[in-house]
From Swiss-Prot:
Domain free text: The C-terminal short (CTS) helix is essential for catalytic activity. It may be accommodated as a transmembrane helix in the thinned membrane environment of the complex, similarly to the signal peptide in the complex substrates.
Protein name per its UniProtKB record: Signal peptidase complex catalytic subunit sec11
Organism: Aspergillus clavatus (strain ATCC 1007 / CBS 513.65 / DSM 816 / NCTC 3887 / NRRL 1 / QM 1276 / 107)
Cell location: Endoplasmic reticulum membrane
An annotated GO cellular component: signal peptidase complex
Coiled-coil segments: none
Ranges in the topological domain labelled Cytoplasmic: 1-18
Broad enzyme group: hydrolase
Transmembrane intervals: 19-39
Gene (UniProt): sec11
């Protein structure tokens, strides 16, 4: 009877240790993500290219690393932005900037009482697209505001690494298969 209680207590401890290890892995991943977000000043410091609109620069499935600490976006820079009201990151190149001229700064000072310059305004386009992105922007929006709409500027990439996330979102049954394989591995590992 005592050996039964001892083995039962031991298996409970092992189960609890596995749960705590899993929680540790999840919390570590979350903290790394948040730390990277703070370091890059981007809400999403890593994104996956979802379409072929930026070919040949980036292919579908490429993993992009973003940086959002620059106060202005330059002509030709590749940026990631979210359309207002939608949470789909779009990766396109800045094809036109609307720099604030001195007259605008004076007008802003007259209206607001401060001489702060309005945000950098941008027009973007995919390298593989015929037209600019004005049709993709929110209703009544003709350009992007650097501070409001831009998630970050592309600073690096890893080819095809993000294709796994595309496959998992396009084929939901793959998630089930993957979870089943991981569960089977946990069960088999426990028996040893």
């Amino acid at each position: 009877m005592l050996s039964f209680l001892s083995s039962n207590l031991s298996s409970t401890r092992q189960s609890l240790a596995q749960v705590l290890n899993f929680a540790l892995v999840l919390s570590t991943a979350f903290m790394l993500w948040k730390g990277l977000s703070v370091f890059t000043a981007s809400s999403s410091p890593i994104v996956v290219v979802l379409s072929g609109s930026m070919e040949p620069a980036f292919q579908r499935g490429d993993l992009l690393f973003l940086w959002n600490r620059s106060p202005r976006a330059e002509l030709g820079e590749i940026v990631v932005y979210n359309v207002r009201g939608k949470d789909i990151p779009i990766v396109h190149r800045v094809v036109r900037t609307f720099p604030e001229v001195e007259g605008k700064a004076k007008k802003v000072k007259e209206i607001t009482g401060t001489s702060s310059i309005p945000p950098n305004m941008l027009l973007t386009k995919g390298d593989n697209n015929v037209a600019d992105d004005t049709e993709l922007y929110a209703k009544n929006q003709d350009f992007l505001h650097r501070e409001e709409d831009i998630v970050g500027s592309v600073r690096g990439y890893m080819p095809m690494v993000g294709y796994v996330t595309i496959m998992l979102s396009e084929h939901p049954w793959l998630k089930t298969v993957l979870l089943g394989i991981m569960g089977l591995m946990v069960i088999l590992q426990r028996e040893q």
